[in-house]
Amino acid sequence: VADCDVLVLARYMQILSAEFTDQWVMKIINIHHSFLPAFVGADPYRQAYEKGVKLIGATAHYVTADLDQGPIIEQDVKRVDHRYTVTELRQLGAEVERQVLARAVLWHVEDRIIVFGNKTVVFE
């Protein structure tokens, strides 16, 4: 693991310790299945459904000791309405998650991201 340039968390669903994240500053990328800062933590599609949202999304971000609070690398959304079930939201969101995570990892390995405070600048 010591020779890795990036760690990618896809459906990992575990909280990393501060000791671990401090060793990998801005080198761990997580995909969160909501448009952060909305619906932090577990089961965001259910949270979105219960709020009756009109957009669902995904966020790729660098992992910090604070859950789902790291600098955002990429986000995208899809429009939904009251007819969508939680299962349908998850299915639609899965494709958004794949696209967002792929772009974030690509930009990271191509050194196209600068982190400034808790924000990122991504060069195209």
State what each model feature region is.
Residues V1-C4:
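Glycine-rich phosphate-binding loop signature in dinucleotide/nucleotide-binding domains
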Residues V6-E124:
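Donor/substrate-binding cores of folate-linked one-carbon enzymes
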